[in-house]
Amino acid sequence: MTPLDPTRPEGSRLDLQPLWRRDDPDGRSIPALDHPWGARHRPDWQARGLVIWPRGGQWCRLRLTLACPPDWRALQQPRPRVQARLALRWWAECMELRVDGRAVHSGDLFDTGCRWLLPAVWWQGRPLQLELRLRSPRHDDGALIHSRLELEPLTAADPLGVLDPQRQQLRELRRRAGVDESPQAGAGFHVLGHAHLDLAWLWPVADTWQAAERTFASALGLMERFAALHFAHSTPALYAWLEQHRPALWSRLRQAVAAGRFEPINGPWVECDCVLISTASLLRQFQLGQHDSRARFPGLDHRLAWLPDSFGFGAGLPAVAAATGVRWFCTHKLFWNASNPFPHRLFRWRARCGAEQLALMTAPIGSDGDPLTMERHRLEWQRATGLGELLWLPGVGDHGGGPTAEMLEQLDLWNRQPEAAPQRHGSLRAYLAGLEPHAAQLPVWRDELYLELHRGCATTRPDQKRHNRSLERLLRQAELAGVLAALVAGPRARGPQPLPDWRPLLFQQFHDILPGTAIPEVFEQAEPQWRASRRAARRIRDQGLDAWLTGSGAGGRTGPADSSRQLWWAVQLQPLPVRRPSVRLPAGRWLSGDSPLPSQPAREGGTWVQLPPTAGVMAAPVWRQSGGARPGPVAPDEPPPELPTQAVWVDGRRAGNGALSLQLGPGGIEQLWDDQGRPQLAAPLAWCRHADRGEFWDAWDIAANYRSRPLPWRWQGQPQWRERGPLCAGFLWRGTCGASRVRLDGRLLAGSPWLELVLSIDWRQRHELLRLEVPLAERADRWAADTSGGMLERPAEPLTARERARWEVAAISWMASCGGSGGLAVLLDGPQGVSAGADRLGVSLLRAPTWPDPGADNGWQRQRLALLPCANGWRAAGVPEQALAFREPLLLRRGGHATPGPVSTTARAALPALPAGVQLLGLRPLGRQGAVISLINSSPCRQAVDLGPGWCIGGRLDGLDQPLGTAWHTDAAILPPTASGPAGQALLRLKPWELGFWLIRAAGPPLTVPAAEA
């Protein structure tokens, strides 16, 4: 490429790319564009005129002596009429611009451009010594994308016509778009300053607080200089931190909010991941975010959810958002689709239950004031929606920053040019209000918002997913235990009891923490927070359960100590259908009342015991007679142990329990049969290992061609039985994956409809993917899985390009095939990445990316799942309920020693089993009014839920605990004798797929319960 003569600028711009110099490998100074590395390794970038250097945090130093071209100096005579800016754009982890040895600007991967104003001495003829110091990203090669000088007029009149080239380009853009070359009536920009701020990503959380402080202070300062500027920011968690730790800045911010210049655009507590969290967590994100926003900014209407950067959105999100008062949903992320552009920019997003959000696909976040870029996006918006005014969001993002003075000056300059579409600064709420009249004519989207990218997020960093599900379970259980404790406390309750704090969990669900796509420091610092939150929630749960089980908070004995007989409680905190689980307990003889329970010595210590039947939320008392490691002999006057329900049998390489059976062999689990004897597998279960490299977004993305790059997985011999008995048959299989040791444990229990599999692995690989493939004996027509906010169903064979792009999706707790005569379900302790076809189900277990966390996934990992035959389909098999039972096993609580004499302890019952398809999202205290029960109907049928005689049903509520309809008792459905329930029975009615909330209280005396959260 021939270098441009710096004395001959092309119009009002001067390209500097050919003028930079750097040292070659021999230490000689050469033109930067001629450096041999770029031509060899990145010819595509070289062809675009980029200055390139290698990845891995390597430094590149560029130098340039910049003299003012004589033609430009003449423009300043007899008086200054123009100014010049140094416009740079880079792709570098760190950038510093030095002029005459003095640092004048810095940037990074997020602040990727500048328009530095050249000083007066340059116009007077003194050359400037420019130096650029750039450090390449760790994951990608570095580049100086463009560098040029740009002239600007000092007045909007532009007497020298220095803006004429851009004016002509604006006219050409419109001409190619088929519209008038001049701005049409109604065309324009609604300008709103913004700063996307990730709570953690390539920096720890502590940096985020500092970035937020800088960003908000900068925005408030710019408001004093630019009278039109409006600024908006999301995330209630940030505002809560600011109020507590920076009161002076918070006071300034509140004043700007009152003046209408600073706009909180909240929604959930943080900009959370919206496909990896359960419906209960998604609901809490919106509940806490909305409660906090209404309390902190009471003068504003908080009916919008700002989620520009989350990696896709489950189909149930509109129902959750609508239940908490949200009407508008705003995102930008679907512009990142790698295969199929999303078809709408403005639409109605409808959940299965009929709840809707008005949805806006915004222009890019982190934009600037370039008029050509702005007009290009505006024309695209106009073509997609028929509307002329585009929301424009200038501001440095990701690591905060917001709009800069340079951006605002450029915007102001072009707002005074008749060739550019006019701008008006204003709030997001005002812009959305202008779109409201078009709502009835908008297209309707009845599906998830699947991001055709970042498909590895459900699999990366399984430790974060494990922390998330365990803490969420403890928080729900702690709230429910508080309600149970209030059932027995009544008037004896002394003041408000502690309630679990959801905020640590919700914070860690941020869309770069839970997916595992941050630097290692983020996860190292999160670890003690996970542990502390679990301890606190467990303590509150246990206190509540003790109060419920003993009738007081003492949790004490039932009588004089008798060391030979101990009371234990088997506690079920999910309203599941009747079942008779088998669990491992401490060694001894176990009884229900005076009757021995079926038992079997456990190989790893303790005793397998089949408990009495459980149904609903309840606690069943069982008694332990200590007798060493094995159950003692039966006394002559003691009844023999009852026979196990669905006892396990083992015959050679086969085993079963009446609900399913399996066969082991050289291939591992070679066959599985349902209770009718129908085979489920077309071939043995396949544990697969693949190369997984080459994606730019390493931790985010699975290589699309991973199936074509298999790697060996070696097993040692055949699986071997380790336990054989009427309650448990267990096997063990060892192997290796490269340098990683693998152990597979399988277990079939009496009374269990599933085969449990636990894969333990010392994972040492890099850039590999570990998967389980389940070959189906019966071809599937469709498949289903649960997702955040509901469930999804898909054809087994994709029919459209959009369906083909969904080759990996996130499932929370189960997936199932649907064939002509049944299917097979995989229960997950997820979330997990899953896939399906007509002949297989697949689960992604582990990955090994190296950026941004070099050791992601490495170390000891334990993956737990189960196989469940569905003879008559997944609904008839109760797969959602079985997944709950699999993920949330019974709690065993030690009570005390028995009183000599007959046993009088009875079971505790709180809630009956819910109808098939209805799940409990939460049961939590609501001050002294009672409790709030949250239910979701995941079926296509209307449901009527009977809470039993122990509960009085008050009014129906919305998701923010506000009454719907009229007052207490009027929202209960009292069915006539001809209806599904007996006369006078109070039922909760749910429409298909509906989310519902009710105020309930214990029947009888007024209920005193823990105080609601502040």
PLM regions: where:
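Aromatic-lined ligand-binding clefts that engage carbohydrates, nucleic acids, or primary amines
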Residues: R73-G101, W569-P575, V583-R584
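Extended carbohydrate-recognition surfaces in non-catalytic/accessory domains of CAZymes
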Residues: M1-W72, D273, P684-P719
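Histidine-centered catalytic/metal-binding microenvironments
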Residues: M1-R28, A32, I145-H190, L199-A200, ...
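Catalytic alpha-helical scaffold of carbohydrate-active enzymes acting on polysaccharides/glycoconjugates
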Residues: G178-V191, A211-F226, W241-R303, G312-A323, ...
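C-terminal (or distal) subdomains of carbohydrate-active enzymes
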Residues: L317-A322, W336, R345-L346, M361, ...
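Beta-strand-rich ligand-recognition modules
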Residues: M95-H146
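Alpha-helical scaffold elements lining the catalytic groove of polysaccharide deacetylases
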Residues: C274-A295, T362-Q382, A729
